[in-house]
Structures are given as C-alpha cells and as structure tokens.
Amino acid sequence: MAASSSGEKEKERLGGGLGVAGGNSTRERLLSALEDLEVLSRELIEMLAISRNQKLLQAGEENQVLELLIHRDGEFQELMKLALNQGKIHHEMQVLEKEVEKRDSDIQQLQKQLKEAEQILATAVYQAKEKLKSIEKARKGAISSEEIIKYAHRISASNAVCAPLTWVPGDPRRPYPTDLEMRSGLLGQMNNPSTNGVNGHLPGDALAAGRLPDVLAPQYPWQSNDMSMNMLPPNHSSDFLLEPPGHNKENEDDVEIMSTDSSSSSSESD
C-alpha cells in the first residue's frame, strides 16, 4: 500500500512538472526530465524489489509506473532532438555573427574609402567649376591674335629687352637704336632725296628713276603702298620698275644689309 501511495504522489508530481516545464528553457526542461526519469526508475526498482520479497504488489501499479517512465523517456528524447537542433542553430548563429562582424568591418572600410573619394571628387568638381568660370570669362573677353601681335609690337618697340650693365632708372640709353638715331643714320639719309646723290650707295639709274630697288622695298603691308608712292615722281609709270643697268653684286650685298636695318627701324617706329 505504501508503494501505491508513493506511485500516486509521483504521478501528481510528474503531472505538475509537465505543466510547469512548458514555459521553461530547453535546458531546464531537459534537467527536469532527467530528474523524473531518475525518480521513476528508482520507484520502479523499489516496487520490483518489494514485490519480489513480499509478493504484495499489484500488477496494475507496476504497469502504471512503467508507462510513466516510457512516456517520460519519449519526452526526454524529443527534448534531446530539440536541443540538438537548437545547438545547430546556435552554431549557425555564431558563424553568422562572425560573418556580420567581418561584413561590418568591410563596410566601415568602404565607408572610409567612399568618404575619401567624395572629398577628392568634391575638390575636383570645385577646380573644374573654377576652370569653367575662367574659360567662360576668357571667351567673353576674347582678344584677337592681331591685337596681341600689335600689343607685343608696341612693347618691343618702346621697351628695352636687355639694358646695359651700368643702366639706372632714368637713363635714356636703350639696347637698340632709337628713332632719332635711326633717322640720323645712313638709312635715314638714303630716304632723304637731298642726300641720295652724296652717299652713292644706290645705283644712279635707280635714283634717277625715283624708286628703291626691290630688296629695299618695305616688308610691311601697311607701309609698302605709302612708301612706294612717296618715292615715285609725279610722271613715273610702271614701265620703269625694271632693274637698273648698273646693278652689281657689291651693291646687292649693301642693299640687303640696309634692307634688314630698314625693317627693324620700321617695326620700332610703328
């Protein structure tokens, strides 16, 4: 009778334990199932020992304890499967956490690189905008090449490019002949009709014809017409534009030298 009463108490405890174990973690449920299996196994062994010694135990009570033990063992096996699945899931979670940490590190590195690239691109865009502004400003204030050439000619004609070593501010000397020096020189005297006959550097026929040889003709288009017309007499015609009979090699060399000087003086005076 004591064994039957203990078996009934065990049934009540197991029933209450199953109701409470439903809201616990898997680990607690496994521990509870192990304790129940241990208690049921001990109870079954005691019942078998008593029935063997005294032969007073009823067969129904032994079967009930055995059924409870089998049922509890089935629950324990289910919990073991659940624990294994949860262990696999936990392992996968750990792997995923490591992967997430790695990806997070990669994202931070990429974010750093993107910030650097953004800064570089912002600088490049700013510089490009400034260049576009400069280009637009240059287009609006464009200057023709002729104006630049004229301005360069004025600078070269009115400013020195290489001053003497003893030159000081206010010194009138220049590293090139001034307009006054050019007019008082040999070339300036050649252009003066009153002194052409005295110098004798040009052939007599050319002077008599009232013209300069072709090599002495001005090299600038804006001077050629005016100077040629000034050198021609009123009754001059195009029939006299042939080379003079007295033209020779010596006079040609002198004329070439003087023509070079004439070109330089014309550019400076303009």
Swiss-Prot record:
Stated family: Belongs to the Mediator complex subunit 4 family.
Cellular compartment(s): Nucleus
Name the record gives this protein: Mediator of RNA polymerase II transcription subunit 4
Keyword Phosphoprotein: yes
Low complexity compositional bias, start-end: 259-270
PANTHER family, per the entry: MEDIATOR OF RNA POLYMERASE II TRANSCRIPTION SUBUNIT 4
Chief site of localization: nucleus
Keywords per UniProt: Acetylation, Activator, Coiled coil, Nucleus, Phosphoprotein, Transcription, Transcription regulation
Gene Ontology terms for molecular function: nuclear thyroid hormone receptor binding; nuclear vitamin D receptor binding; transcription coactivator activity; transcription coregulator activity
